[in-house]
């Protein structure tokens, strides 16, 4: 969609095949809706090199965009300069800023949902008042025990002395996803400078932005929000 809005004349989609060699039908349906010009059943680092340098069946492209695993990112780093890329992304991440009035159950659900990405995806919870993190940790353990899809994950608990200090930490770490669910969420949002996307208020869960409300899901990760922005037509 972003490529079409930007006026790209040739849109090429690559997607890893299933064991039967076929691309998932939902992916093909999405490609049809977006009017992709070419579709190839190939994924991983090999897809990146094929797009950048061409093969007997794939003509090279000028720009490669889209998320991927560590091997995909390594390949994008290797071909950067031969072709343009959207960003150098690491594992998906989430930071939540909360206080004593936050709904800790909802915060725990959002953190555990993000944990489904795997243990390499960093999760950070920042409180602006004493005593919140202990209660949140207990809630996360309860939710994780209820959800069979939750994997082992890394959750950092940060006790910030003030809301301003919490936002300073956010701007230095540049999270991909930032949830502001403290009482002062709306006021704090205007001070955020580097997050890939910002969810303001208790009912603005990350999953909504990833799958429903967001303009796209190609966001800077691993602190690269300081130098990269989300994928856009610009």
Annotate each language-model stretch with its function.
Residues 1-29:
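Conserved small-residue-rich beta-alpha loop and adjacent elements
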Residues 10-14, 38-41, 124, 178-181, ...:
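Short hydrophobic alpha-helical runs that function as membrane-insertion/retention elements
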Residues 15-19, 44, 69, 100-102, ...:
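Short, ordered loop/turn segments at secondary-structure junctions
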Residues 18-23, 42-50, 163, 185:
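Short acidic loop-to-helix transition motifs that present clustered carboxylates
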Residues 28-30, 56, 80-82, 110-115, ...:
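Short, solvent-exposed amphipathic alpha-helical segments in soluble enzyme
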Residues 113, 117, 125-195:
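A glycine- and small/hydrophobic-rich beta-loop-beta segment
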């Amino acid at each position: 969609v972003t490529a079409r809005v930007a006026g790209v004349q040739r849109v090429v989609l690559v997607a890893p095949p299933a064991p039967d060699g076929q691309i998932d039908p939902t992916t093909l349906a999405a490609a049809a809706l977006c009017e992709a010009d070419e579709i190839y059943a190939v994924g991983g680092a090999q897809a990146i090199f094929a797009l950048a340098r061409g093969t007997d069946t794939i003509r090279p492209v000028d720009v490669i965009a889209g998320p991927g695993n560590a091997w995909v990112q390594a390949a994008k780093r290797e071909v950067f300069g031969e072709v343009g890329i959207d960003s150098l992304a690491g594992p998906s991440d989430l930071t939540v800023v909360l206080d004593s009035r936050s709904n800790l159950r909802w915060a725990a659900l959002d953190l555990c949902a993000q944990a489904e990405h795997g243990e390499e995806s960093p999760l950070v919870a920042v409180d602006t008042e004493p005593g919140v993190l202990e209660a949140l940790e207990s809630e996360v353990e309860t939710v994780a025990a209820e959800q069979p899809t939750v994997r082992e994950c890394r959750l950092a608990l940060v006790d910030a002395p003030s809301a301003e200090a919490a936002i300073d930490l956010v701007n230095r770490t540049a999270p991909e996803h930032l949830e502001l669910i403290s009482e002062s969420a709306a006021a704090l949002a205007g001070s955020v400078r580097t997050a890939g996307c910002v969810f303001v208020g208790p009912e603005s869960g990350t999953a909504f932005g990833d799958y429903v409300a967001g303009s796209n899901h190609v966001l800077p990760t691993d602190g690269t929000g300081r130098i990269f922005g989300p994928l856009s037509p610009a």
